Amino acid sequence: MSFGGKKFRSKRQQLAYEASLAGRYQKHMNKNPFLWFGLPFCSVIVLGSFWLSEFTAVRYQQKDQKVQEMKEDDLVKMKANQRQFDIKEEYYRLQGLGEQDWEPKRIPRFKGESENVW
């Protein structure tokens, strides 16, 4: 036989517990659990999302600062400094990009480690 979730208290201890804040809360909680637990929990979730929206707004404000409308003078300067683009030239440049300056290098193994030949 067990007491379950109830803690054994003497009669005097039980009266003192019921007079305390925790005891009164437990009494109300047993009568209306949603009102005393569910509703505060849901309200904390909703209010927390409103309070945290300020932090998420900073993220979008930073992205908006990066993307700004350009003035005509800046656009003309950017076009003047732009490299000439030819699709065939880019294709041939990218074809030979990875093969020029690398060589396979064997990484040393730890002592006792197998070679794992496939």
Curated annotation (Swiss-Prot):
The chain crosses the membrane at residues 33-53. It comes from the Eukaryota. It is a single-pass membrane protein. One of its GO terms (cellular component) is mitochondrial inner membrane. GO terms for biological process: mitochondrial cytochrome c oxidase assembly. It is found in: Mitochondrion inner membrane. Keywords: Membrane, Mitochondrion, Mitochondrion inner membrane, Transit peptide, Transmembrane, Transmembrane helix. Required for the assembly of the mitochondrial respiratory chain complex IV (CIV), also known as cytochrome c oxidase. May participate in merging the COX1 and COX2 assembly lines. PANTHER family: CYTOCHROME C OXIDASE ASSEMBLY PROTEIN COX16 HOMOLOG, MITOCHONDRIAL, MITOCHONDRIAL OUTER MEMBRANE PROTEIN 25. Belongs to the COX16 family. This is Cytochrome c oxidase assembly protein COX16, mitochondrial. It comes from Kluyveromyces lactis (strain ATCC 8585 / CBS 2359 / DSM 70799 / NBRC 1267 / NRRL Y-1140 / WM37) (Yeast).
